[in-house]
UniProtKB/Swiss-Prot annotation:
This is Probable cobyric acid synthase. The keyword RNA-binding does not apply. One of its GO terms (molecular function) is ABC-type vitamin B12 transporter activity. Residues 252-444 form the GATase cobBQ-type domain. The gene is cobQ. It comes from the Archaea. Pfam families: CbiA (PF01656), GATase_3 (PF07685). Keywords: Cobalamin biosynthesis, Glutamine amidotransferase. The keyword Lipid biosynthesis does not apply. Catalyzes amidations at positions B, D, E, and G on adenosylcobyrinic A,C-diamide. NH(2) groups are provided by glutamine, and one molecule of ATP is hydrogenolyzed for each amidation.
Length: 492
């Protein structure tokens, strides 16, 4: 039988995900078998669990904090927005239906049943389950249909913590309002409050904390400091709307990333942040970097349409002829082909469309979706790299180019034992692959970065800076939480 703890928030982006990860790592460090859990998540950033099903990137990262293999039961319901208020609903890792909010709401009992099934499995297999809520736990206009917050805590009699973000202001009002608006049976579940993202001297909060404890009858368990150095994968593509660049501006290597309107799995870029400067470019921008990446997208045909409208194919070809390196991942790989065939308009309302014609390849869209943890041997310049990744794609690609990866496990282009395409343009190089997470393979990542560094007379890089940073961040934040928060009321 597991102990259940739930982290809920006064708002979105209050820090629930990182607090949950911190608690997971604290308990894992104590030798417990721990599982993360989020009943319902909405994200275009997903990973593949051990059952070859999709879960949100946040629950994947939290599984790293727990030091356990990710499972579809960590995130039984995943909503992947498709546009026009429609989401693809993923249940236990597999596509269920495309639904709007009203359809989803009417099927609440079915989804609740699936959530309960996952909770029963986790209850049997783990010592602790650290649950994360979604958004605000008290959207009073949505409470009767909310299956992501305290209704789920009540099912398992979880001890709940309320997290409030002081950085955005109004923290005490948001705490008081949230608690007072909750139904009494859910209010009783909250055992403590965490004030998150604080900058400055904690003494200035003393009077406010005393007052909020008096008004609510719930103790403030701790104040967690704001820390810009904490680097964990983002799950929300909204962060990209205002982001122009990130990474190491002193690295000597610049990577341009095409800013797709429906970008997905942009965490593919995270491993590059330590060894390159990453700059997003729009369709009408010039290519200024050493490497150009076409990331994943929820709508390859629509992105191909916009790229062609801006004559981006001409820019890419010129860039390759000048010695540039172009890399397409998943949907980004599809748009680099000759044609995208979508006769029934399954992928978008665009239908069939020409790609950028970098590769002699055609992609066909149908009803099937590939979700696989994959591995194989990547060959480039007479070098072979043993690589791992994960595939989440609709569309099968038939390429006449040299394949990039000989598959040992997975699906790849079209189930023929190969993945991707590779093509040289003089000193230029074009690479396409369905392997998300390709840059997590540090030997391949370093090889690509070092191609540019050698051209510029810079020293080569070695080692796995990304993996080291994730572990360092998880351990560091666990220490911060343990130091800042009184965990005894939670039984930790």
């Amino acid at each position: 039988m597991a102990e259940f703890i739930m982290v809920v928030g006064t708002s979105s982006n209050s820090g629930k995900t990182t607090i949950t990860a911190g608690l997971c790592r604290i308990l894992a460090n104590k030798g417990y078998k721990v599982a993360p859990f989020k009943s319902q998540n909405m994200s275009l950033n997903s990973r593949v669990a051990k059952e070859d099903g999709e879960i949100a990137i946040a629950q994947y990262t939290q599984s790293l904090a727990c030091r356990v293999e990710p499972s579809v039961h960590f995130n039984p319901i995943l909503l992947k927005p498709k546009g026009n208020f429609i989401s693809q609903v993923i249940v236990h890792g597999r596509p269920y239906k495309d639904m709007n909010y009203n359809e989803y709401r009417k099927n609440k009992d079915f989804f609740l049943k699936k959530i309960k099934e996952s909770l029963e499995i986790l209850d049997r297999e783990y010592d602790y389950v650290i649950m994360e809520g979604a958004g605000s736990c008290c959207e009073i206009n949505l409470l009767k249909d909310d299956i992501a917050n305290l209704r789920i805590a009540e099912l398992v009699n979880a001890k709940a913590i309320l997290v409030a973000d002081i950085d955005r202001g109004g923290v005490f009002a948001s705490i008081y309002g949230t608690i007072k608006l909750l139904p009494e049976n859910w209010r009783k579940l909250i055992k403590g409050i965490i004030i998150n993202k604080f900058r400055g001297n904690v003494e200035v909060l003393k009077e406010g904390i005393e007052k909020i404890e008096e008004l609510t009858g719930i103790p403030v368990l701790g104040i967690v400091p704001y820390d810009e150095n904490l680097v964990l994968p983002e799950e929300d593509s909204q962060v990209l709307q205002s982001m122009r660049s990130f990474g190491n501006a002193k690295s000597g290597v610049e990577i341009n990333v095409v800013r797709f309107s429906k970008i997905s799995n942009f965490t593919d870029l995270d491993p590059l942040r330590y060894d390159a400067f990453i700059k997003f470019i729009d369709f009408d921008d010039d290519i200024t970097g050493d490497i150009l990446i076409f990331p994943g997208t929820r709508s390859s045909t629509k992105e191909a349409y916009y790229l062609k409208q801006h004559n981006f194919d001409e820019k890419v070809l010129e860039f390759l002829k000048d010695g540039g390196i172009v890399i397409g991942i998943c949907g980004g790989y599809q748009v680099l082909g000759k044609e995208l065939i979508d006769k029934e308009k399954k992928e978008s309302d665009v239908g069939d469309i020409e790609g950028l014609k970098i590769f002699d390849a055609k992609t066909y869209f149908g009803n099937d979706k590939v979700v696989k943890n994959s591995c194989g041997f990547l060959e480039i310049d007479n070098k072979t790299f043993n690589v791992k990744g994960y595939e989440i794609h609709e569309g099968f690609t038939y390429s006449k180019e040299k394949p990039l990866i000989k598959i040992e496990r997975g699906f790849g282009n079209c189930g023929n034992g190969f993945d991707g395409s590779i093509k040289k343009f003089g000193d230029g190089l074009a690479i396409g692959t369905y392997f998300h997470g390709i840059f997590e393979n540090y030997e391949f990542r370093n090889y690509i970065i070092n191609l540019i560094r050698k051209r510029k007379g810079l020293d080569e890089i070695y080692g796995d800076s990304y993996k080291d940073s994730i572990e360092k961040s998880l351990n560091y934040f666990a220490e911060v939480v343990e130091r800042s928060v009184n965990l005894k009321p939670l039984g930790i």
